[in-house]
């Protein structure tokens, strides 16, 4: 078992998120709290959840380095960080992994992030590798997202954008039917085929979906399959922003 956790958000006395904080004292307090709650002596992988523009990344990386030297943390990770910030952090404390969104539904990391990670020897941990459920074939033009479902606030899932984006699901479905696999398995297998140092983290609440996701590791996509998915997804102009403006401002670029 590898234990990964994060620091980087500030909360009030009621547990409500109030913003970002990567102040050294707050990092240390977050780690102590995580160790206590997890009942462990060390955290395998400690991520900065979001880059705090108020705190130099060198100070953040230096604090994590001290925690590693103290044996409380084993590896340093970052999340939603841009290339320049990653390089600066890596110069102080080697970064083991970067978390960010990546899938057939969101291929922006291919432009700058993936080349930089390959150069620096940093692993990539894509979250939402199934496009928040979009790449499972279970989301349709008529899908209604309930209260508390983050997709209800995401521009890509607004009705007009959703209807246009379903063209992407159609091309993945075509490959899935040919391979006798599910749409989600094809989407995950495509990710796994991109780089050997990519480890997607699909979330699920259901055991059968976990089994389905694991099945993607046995799915062999041929060069022709991959080329079809690459060219097909490139031809679909995904509609709608990834996040609302307020959330987008918390991403380091």
Task: Spell out what each predicted region is.
Residues 51-231, 246-253:
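Beta/alpha (TIM)-barrel catalytic core signal, keyed to glycine-rich beta->alpha loops juxtaposed to Asp/Glu
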Residues 10-17, 209-212:
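A short acidic, helix-capping loop that chelates divalent metal ions and anchors anionic groups
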Residues 1-11:
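A short, structured active-site edge motif that brings together acidic residues
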Residues 1, 40-43, 73, 95:
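Local beta-strand N-terminus motif with an aromatic residue
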Residues 13-28, 54:
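Active-site mouth loops of central-metabolism enzymes
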Residues 22-37, 82-87:
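Short, acidic/polar
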């Amino acid at each position: 078992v590898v234990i990964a956790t994060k620091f980087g958000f500030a909360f009030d006395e009621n547990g409500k998120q109030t913003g970002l904080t990567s102040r050294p004292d707050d990092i240390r307090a977050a780690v102590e709290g995580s160790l206590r709650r997890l009942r462990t002596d060390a955290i395998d992988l400690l991520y900065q959840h979001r880059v705090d523009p108020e705190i130099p990344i060198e100070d953040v990386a230096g604090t994590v380095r001290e925690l590693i030297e103290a044996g409380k943390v084993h590896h340093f990770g970052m999340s939603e960080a841009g290339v320049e910030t990653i390089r600066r952090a890596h110069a102080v404390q080697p970064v083991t992994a970067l978390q960010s969104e990546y899938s057939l539904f969101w291929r922006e990391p291919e432009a700058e992030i993936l080349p930089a990670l390959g150069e620096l020897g940093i692993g990539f941990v894509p979250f939402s590798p199934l496009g928040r459920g979009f790449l499972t074939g279970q989301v349709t033009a008529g899908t209604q997202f309930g209260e508390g479902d983050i997709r209800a606030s995401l521009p890509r899932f607004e009705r007009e954008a959703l209807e246009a984006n379903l063209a992407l699901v159609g091309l993945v479905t075509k490959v899935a039917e040919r391979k006798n696999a599910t749409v989600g398995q094809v989407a995950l297998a495509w990710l796994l085929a991109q780089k050997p140092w990519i480890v997607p983290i699909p979330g699920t609440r259901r055991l059968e979906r976990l089994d389905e996701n694991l099945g993607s590791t046995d799915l062999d996509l041929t060069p022709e399959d991959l080329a079809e998915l690459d060219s097909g997804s490139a031809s679909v102009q995904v509609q709608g922003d990834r996040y609302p403006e307020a959330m987008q401002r918390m991403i380091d670029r």
